[in-house]
């Protein structure tokens, strides 16, 4: 079940393998998902979700979804993180310019003391001849 882009307070990130053991086959789960698909041969596809985590564990963070054609995984991942950080920064009263370099943004985070960090999950692929390709990236909530 796709949900909003809010990272609930107190959420912890856990690796995929132990998380999968917590979800029985066929279970309905909550997620924030990005998906991109095409059947155009040679087309570069990418899907990414980015997370921005606040320093205050009682506060909520943000999760962004981003999908594109022609971007590398690194470009899409950085963009997804920037989107999530910009959403969180706006709610915390931090002036955040997505066009600044990562080093400048990291310094803003450090000085503000309000954002712990960002991360992303990204998948990319090139469409093969005579086929259809879908890339998917998701944050899945385990309760």
PLM region descriptions:
Residues 1-143:
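Helix-coil modules at protein/domain termini and other flexible surface or pore-lining loops
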């Amino acid at each position: 079940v796709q949900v909003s882009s809010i990272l609930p307070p107190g959420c912890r990130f856990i690796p995929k393998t132990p998380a999968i053991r917590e979800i029985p086959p066929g279970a309905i789960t909550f997620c924030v998902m990005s998906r991109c698909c095409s059947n155009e041969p040679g087309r570069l596809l990418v899907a990414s979700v980015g997370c921005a985590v606040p320093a205050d564990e009682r506060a909520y963070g943000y999760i962004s979804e981003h999908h594109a054609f022609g971007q590398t995984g690194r470009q899409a991942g950085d963009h997804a993180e920037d989107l999530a950080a910009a959403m969180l920064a706006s709610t915390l009263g931090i002036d955040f310019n997505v066009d600044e370099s990562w080093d400048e943004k990291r310094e803003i985070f450090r000085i503000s003391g309000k954002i712990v960090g960002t991360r992303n999950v990204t998948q990319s692929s090139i469409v093969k001849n005579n086929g259809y390709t879908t890339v998917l990236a998701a944050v899945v909530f385990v309760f």
